[in-house]
Amino acid sequence: MTWELIAQLTFLTSIIVSGPLVIALLAIRKGNL
């Protein structure tokens, strides 16, 4: 495991994890309005 591969994996995982979170936050904001 090279550092570049680890960095790419963490970057992809953060995008995959943060995607639904951002959508949920937008849905909550729209619901509050």
Swiss-Prot record:
Keyword Aminoacyl-tRNA synthetase on entry: no
Keyword check for Acyltransferase: no
Any one GO BP annotation for this protein: photosynthesis
Organism of origin: Psilotum nudum (Whisk fern)
GO cellular component terms, semicolon-separated: chloroplast thylakoid membrane; photosystem II
Topology term for the membrane: Single-pass membrane protein
Task performed by this protein: A core subunit of photosystem II (PSII), probably helps stabilize the reaction center.
GO function term, MF aspect, one: actin binding
Keywords from the named record: Chloroplast, Membrane, Photosynthesis, Photosystem II, Plastid, Thylakoid, Transmembrane, Transmembrane helix
Lineage of the species this protein comes from: Eukaryota, Viridiplantae, Streptophyta, Embryophyta, Tracheophyta
InterPro entries documented for this protein: Profilin_CS (IPR027310), PSII_Ycf12_core-subunit (IPR010284)
Transmembrane segments: 5-25
Protein name (database record): Photosystem II reaction center protein Psb30
Gene from which this protein is expressed: psb30
Cell location: Plastid, Chloroplast thylakoid membrane
Pfam families attached to this UniProt entry: PSII_Ycf12
Subunit structure of this chain's protein: PSII is composed of 1 copy each of membrane proteins PsbA, PsbB, PsbC, PsbD, PsbE, PsbF, PsbH, PsbI, PsbJ, PsbK, PsbL, PsbM, PsbT, PsbX, PsbY, PsbZ, Psb30/Ycf12, peripheral proteins of the oxygen-evolving complex and a large number of cofactors. It forms dimeric complexes.
Family: Belongs to the Psb30/Ycf12 family.
